[in-house]
């Protein structure tokens, strides 16, 4: 009921004393890199404490969400190209082009007479296409991390908490028992 009434508390709703907010800005072309960036304007903005390069983009740390978002947009980024095909129409064309005669008659099993069976069969042909649909959870994607001496607490919407725990253990050097997701 809480989700349908807007009363659900998510990780993004967490507030702690001394908390800073980080946001990211990544290449709009899937898989594209970051050739370079100019963060001078963002670094001059009130409340911004850091602008850092990350894989495929930048991260901005600020004292509140609004300032982090504004600073991320103020960073001038030189984006690299994507190694992937751009839109659904191009993707469908690439898949269609991959259907070559090289594998047209390959079979794992060759039993019976297909041509004879098809002569008396009713044939239904159809083609269905749908665009890519990203996983879109109701919870805003976010993570809140609190690192204290020998303990790491993590609040996030995840379907794989063991993965989060293992990766955070590798990053922090903490034992799994000291990491709470």
Sequence positions of predicted segments:
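Structural alpha/beta core scaffold segments of enzyme domains
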Residues: 1-181
């Amino acid at each position: 009921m809480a989700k349908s009434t807007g009363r659900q508390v998510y990780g993004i709703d967490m507030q702690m004393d001394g908390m800073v907010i980080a946001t990211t800005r990544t290449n709009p072309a899937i898989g594209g890199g970051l050739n370079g960036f100019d963060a001078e304007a963002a670094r001059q903005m009130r409340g911004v404490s850091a602008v850092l390069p990350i894989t495929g983009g930048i991260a901005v740390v600020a004292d509140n969400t609004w300032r982090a978002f504004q600073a991320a947009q103020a960073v001038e980024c030189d984006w690299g190209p994507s190694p992937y095909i751009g839109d659904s129409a191009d993707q469908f064309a690439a898949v269609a082009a991959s259907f070559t005669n090289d594998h047209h008659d390959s079979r794992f099993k060759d039993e019976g007479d297909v041509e004879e069976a098809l002569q008396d069969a009713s044939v239904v042909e159809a083609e269905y296409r749908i665009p890519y649909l990203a996983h879109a959870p109701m919870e805003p994607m976010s993570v809140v991390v609190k690192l204290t001496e020998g303990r790491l607490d993590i609040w996030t919407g995840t379907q794989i908490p063991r993965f989060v725990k293992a990766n955070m253990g590798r990053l922090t050097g903490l034992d799994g028992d000291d990491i709470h997701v």
